[in-house]
């Protein structure tokens, strides 16, 4: 009997063990074999928005086809990566979509055959591919996943990159590019993957480190195409050219001359082609060219010298330079320019003396921040040249008018120790603005009408600003200051009042805190609910969420208003037992916290009483007179609790509960806002800032907004009827370039840490606009 029990225990133990193989497959492991293109999308919503809101990329044939291919995925709400794979067959293309199963809710229907493998969803237009991936444990593409950056709008892997006549320098068998798309720009960063192309670039620039570019100082701004590269050792470069499979026939003159230079570039103009060089020792350069002193002519006191070594550049640099046989040259300070056209050299002289070079071109300055400071090779395109490149690359028929805002674009190659980086930027060009000018930075269209006025929130990672907005379907969006949707989150109702930011964990990482009619939300940077939140309420929340940080120690108190009642919660979502407010009448304003002479005051209106409570919810000071509140918020102005009554009088209460009244002559439908020292009022069409006033056009106005930035006061107000935004200083004087178009109140901040300020507003019913204030 004992033996039987012994064996029974062993059998039960064996059969109770879990022999299920734990899968470690990622979505990258299930990319089909022989996929010619793999598109990795970090957020489907953000990707679709970026494509729709970039007027240039939305017109390209490739992305029109891709949008059509994505239609079956309309039910997919993806915040995590989605892979779009393309396999080429004889007569068509096969699309396969791979993502985590959690992105397909149980109520959704996917309009395409699909399978699920270990919580990974694979959908495809090919049944054969669905069968083949079932037994697949990894893929070639999975090795590239480390190149993916979550900040990218999307990335593209091309197993066989098409040969481009417009950019032969980029011809490579396989590449991996990451794209950041905003309404104003297309930025690309990636790498060349195939060994043959990598070896070519490694060989060409062996022991020649990337260097800063300087030829922009001499090349005319009106150049249509520019190619330039650096070399710290010319003779090493010639050996590299030979080793890379090309031929460099550097003569004795070439070695003597080019060894005194460090950078060379070709540029094309309407008058012809030129070659520019930067000398590292102009005296040595003069000596190397001492046999070319025959002055043909002069232009604006600059001599043009004859040059007879017609094949010097082609022989020395081979395919790296445009084929040109220069017959003359000029010297301007440390720069030399060669050409076979006198008009080209005259153009260079004229533009250099007039400071109209690439370096001074607004468009050049615009794109440089997106490029590496040091490069091995760099090329610039003007508008027509860009059109040629894009039409070839994206199977498009873009016309020059479609590209008119893109005055200058660039592509660069940077040879690193183990990789060849490719960077490119297409950026809408904007002229420099004079002081107090306003220009539109971007506009962004959402799929639904906007409910909540857009506001700025701080990005704790970059110390810059992002934009928060809610649509009519109660979706909350976080949008970058470049116009890229970072995430979208469905809420249970409209946001009440404004959204505040808190540092719940005291680590510098900020969360968003706000209330809807039946929820208290705290959301992290990625759009995820913080643990224990949202708090749910059966009774309706009737005022915006109030957040108090009494001692500035980030020990937050969250105050919920429900008609007559106040409920206080701590950072863990637990009720604060020490707070007990005895409800009397319905609360008419959002509770606020003020600290006056070391004492805390929680202030709000209830019926015709101004309540001044302490931290525990008991009356700190009894206000001695009733107040017929106008409905305006309560402020702490000139060391007094301040609001207005229905007669338009200014009502102020001191810390002893005494009430004073000042007749302001405001009408019944007035607005006020205030800082500690500045009072702003609007009555009919009269806007008053401190003691200064301005007559506005008759209209229907938003409440005025007051901003204090860089020791300066800004007052904004929007004519909702005429759709005009006005901006004034503390003297009630309007800024230049106002009014500008807008349909809501604005939020003003320094959104991107540069010199100009930015403000964001609602545009059309489903769009927002960010302006720059110079």
What kind of region is each of these model predictions?
Residues 108-170, 321-395:
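A conserved glycine-rich beta-strand in the N-terminal activation segment of trypsin-fold
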Residues 745-774:
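Blade-level signature of beta-propeller repeat domains, shared across WD40, Kelch, NHL, RCC1
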Residues 481-482, 525-527, 571-574, 614-617, ...:
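Short loop/turn segments that connect beta-strands within beta-propeller blades
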Residues 457, 461-464, 504-510, 549-556, ...:
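Acidic, glycine-anchored loop motifs typical of Ca2+
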Residues 443-474:
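Beta-strand-rich domains and repeat architectures in extracellular enzymes and scaffolds
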